[in-house]
C-alpha cells in the first residue's frame, strides 16, 4: 500500500515533502509526525507549470487532447491523505528537491531543510527541536547548510543559522564569519521568530536568544550556547 507521501506526490505533481516530514525522511528527527508537511507553488504558478507539463508530455497531441475535451491537469486541494492530516504550504520558492523512485516522492534536499528550520521553525517541530537538530547534525551536513543558506537565506536566516552553527555547534568557518555582517541592532530580532522577546541576547549576532534551554547550563548562569550572551 502506498504511503501518504506517495499518494500526495502523485495527486499533486508539483508538491514536495518539506519541513518536519523532510526532517523525518532524512533522519534528522526521531519524531514521527502525525502531520504530512508539503509545499507546492501558488495557484498562478501551479497553473503555469501544469500547462508546461502537459505541453511537454503531450507534444503534438496537445491540440487533439484539448479538442476532445479530455481532462486537463488541475490542482486538487486536499486536507487528508490516507488518513494523515496534510499541512500544505503554497510557496513560490520550494527550494532544491530530489525525486525518489522508491518510495515515489519528491523531497526537499538536506540543505534546504536546514534553511526551512530557521525560516519556519514552527513547521519543523518548534525552535527547541530545531536547536537539537542543528546540534546533532550541523557538523555532518555543514557544507550543504552553508551552500543553501549562502545562496537562498535571507539576512535574518543567515544570522539565526550562524548563531546556531557557531554558538551551539561550536563550528568555526569563514563563511559563518561572513554572515556576521548581517547582524544588526534593533527590530527585536529573535532566534525563535514565534517566541516572545527575551532580554538575553547574543552580542555577536545581535539576536535575542529566546529559547530557554540556551540560556543557562548551571555554570553560574553562563549561556549554554556561547560566552557572548548579555542582558539588556
Model-derived regions: residue spans:
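Short, amphipathic alpha-helical interaction segments positioned at domain boundaries
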Residues: 2-20
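Phosphate-handling catalytic interfaces
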Residues: 25-232
